[in-house]
Amino acid sequence: MRMAAQYEMLTQLAKAGTKLDFGQDLFVKFYQAFIASNRWQQYLKGVIPTLYVTAIALTIGVVLGSVVALVRVAHDQQRRGHHDPALAVANAVCKLYATVIRGTPMMVQMLIMSMVIFANSRNFTMVGALALGINSGAYVSEIIRGGLMAVDPGQMEAGRSLGLNYITTMALIVIPQAIRSVLPALGNEFIVLLKDTSLITVIGGKELLYAA
C-alpha cells in the first residue's frame, strides 16, 4: 500500500509539471512495469517456458555433444595401423557439424530451423528448443572432448593392460575422471542457454522476453 501511495503521489507531481529526480523516475517506471495491474504475474508466466526450453535444449546438447565427443576421441585414440573407415567417416561428419554450428550465428540457425526445416510446424517453442539444443551440442562436444583428452593417457593404457576393452575402460576409468573438469564448463553452458532462449521470440516462441 505504501508503494501504491508513493506511486500515486509521484505521478501526480509529474502531471503537475514537477521534474522527478533519477530515483523517483526509476521507481515510477519499475512500478508501472512490474507492480501496476499485477504485471509481475505476466513475467512469471514467461519464466516457466524459459526454464522448460532451457532444460530441453541442455538435454539435447549434452546427449548430442557426448556422442560427438566420444566419436572424435575414439578416432584420435586409434592405435597406429588400426584405422576404422567407418569411424573416420563419423569423425569427419562430427568435425563438420561442430565447425559449421560454431561458425554460424545462432539467429541464422534459428531462422533456418523455423522457416526451412520445420516450416510447417506451429510449435515454435519446441522448434526453438531444438535449434538451441543442436547449437549447444557443438559447444558441449568440445567441452567434453577437452575433458576426456585432459585425462592422463596412462589411464587408458592401464585399463587396456588389465584386459578391459576400450568401451569399458572409457566408462569405468576415463569418463569418471573427466567429469570433474567438465562440470564447471557445463554450468557456464547452462547459463548461456538460459540467456539464448530470448532468441526464440524472433520465430514466435513464448518465453520470458515474449511475456515482457
What are these regions (language model features)?
Residues 2-212:
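Transmembrane alpha-helices and adjacent helix-loop boundaries
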